[in-house]
């Protein structure tokens, strides 16, 4: 079975730099989805030191990634990348399950999950 989420090499390098900067080299990277935003769902990404029995756990480019059970179907097939431009850099999230997103780009919905929309 392939990993539900792909972390590109560029994203992994930036994540490793962030882990080192924040002295989190031994942490896991948790990615997930929560209700919120004007389209109903928003992404979350952060460092954690404990994993749950229900987490999907996999390694990408030397980073141990955790995805909670509730986020797994929504994020299946997602690619997390890091892009650099003249205006700066940032993570991009390409989720093939997202069918609509808000104008500001901070939230989305899928065909099977409308999430919990909030006012912008």
Swiss-Prot record:
Protein's name in the database: Uncharacterized protein SufA
SUPFAM superfamilies noted in UniProt: HesB-like domain
GO cellular component terms given for this protein: cytoplasm
Domain of life (superkingdom): Bacteria
Gene: sufA
InterPro entries found in the cross-reference section: FeS_biogenesis, FeS_cluster_insertion, FeS_cluster_insertion_CS, HesB-like_dom_sf, ISCA_plant_cyanobact
Naturally occurring in which organism (per UniProt): Bacillus subtilis (strain 168)
Deletion consequences: Not essential for growth on minimal medium.
Family indicated by similarity: Belongs to the HesB/IscA family.
GO BP terms, alphabetized: iron-sulfur cluster assembly
GO MF entries: 2 iron, 2 sulfur cluster binding
């Amino acid at each position: 079975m392939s990993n539900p989420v792909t972390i590109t090499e560029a994203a992994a390098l930036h994540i490793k730099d962030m882990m080192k900067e924040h002295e989190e080299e031994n942490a896991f990277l948790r990615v997930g989805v929560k209700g919120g935003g004007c389209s109903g769902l928003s992404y979350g990404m952060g460092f954690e030191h404990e994993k749950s029995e229900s987490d999907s756990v996999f390694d990408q480019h030397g980073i141990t990634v955790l995805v909670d059970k509730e986020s797994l179907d929504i994020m299946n097939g997602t690619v997390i990348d890091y892009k650099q431009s003249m205006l700066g850099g940032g993570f991009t999230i390409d989720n093939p399950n997202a069918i609509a997103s808000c104008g500001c780009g901070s939230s989305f919905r899928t065909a099977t999950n409308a999430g919990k929309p909030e006012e912008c």
